[in-house]
């Protein structure tokens, strides 16, 4: 099963695999009784109050809700129905959470537009303010009813979101799909109504490119109005319209060749895009080099590495491998860490954790 991939060592997964027929039948009964006017509503899906977890990611504090295994099953069943509905009409360059459309896909697409060199004189960078936390459930359900007419299916989705009056919960498998569904009208508005062809969205983060800067400013004003009227959402105040980076010429200053740079690079998804190369955001690069030095000091003291440091370093290696930053890796990362050794350590730790980990229980469900 997709939702139990790489979790076969967990005892609850082993139990479910051993009693798969009974579990599937119990799930069927639960779904059949999760409908308006069900014959046995006491057998339906009843989510309990979930305890949030807090993580820090890219300098932001995020609230995560972890569903238990049967709740994950229900989410995957919902996505099996939602996925063909959403992907059939989704904008081809809306990335993030779509299969095969991750950050690397988005990066490759944007780089191809830049290399083509047409219609990229200026760019606009916009982001929706607290998108997941600001989505109103009643507005989400209203948008779903536009294309989905099955009251039973809509009721199951609504029950999954009980306890969240405002905001789509991070950590739910259905959340990323619901978010993409909700933003699809915005994609249509920008590409068809406003007529921008060079635009890409990574979740709620978007880049629009055009030769006319005034046209970009007008578009942002209309996007603000569209988001407010239809979804009651706002753009972050950090939106920007800038001339895209290019080298206007070269000159010799004190015997050294210096380039005359006009405009800015596009800071998007943690990458820095220019016409000549793709780099990494300065904060990410500094964090990676500082962590490498810290791990080297731990090694000199004959201390073990922290698991979170190993995971972070392997993540940073991924950034260096897909950008034009090998020189930074060669001088500031490679001398201090052995990537192969780190991979072996984390693999061993993950196997050990899977043997002992227990997933949280939080859903009341009566077996058949």
PLM-predicted stretches and their roles:
Residues 1-25, 29, 358-368:
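Non-catalytic, polymerase-adjacent accessory regions of viral genome-replication enzymes
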Residues 27-60, 73, 149-163:
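Reverse-transcriptase-like RNA-dependent polymerase core
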Residues 48-50, 200-204, 238-240:
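Short Gly/Ser/Thr- and Asp/Glu-enriched loop/turn motifs at secondary-structure junctions
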Residues 61-90, 165-193:
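Conserved pre-motif C helix in the palm subdomain of viral-like polymerases
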Residues 67, 72, 76, 163, ...:
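Right-hand nucleic-acid polymerase module
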Residues 75, 79-136:
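Active-site-proximal segment of RNA-dependent polymerases
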Residues 97-105, 199, 207-209, 240-254:
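Beta-rich nucleic-acid/ligand-interaction surfaces
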Residues 111-203, 207-228, 235, 265, ...:
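Conserved polymerase palm-domain catalytic core
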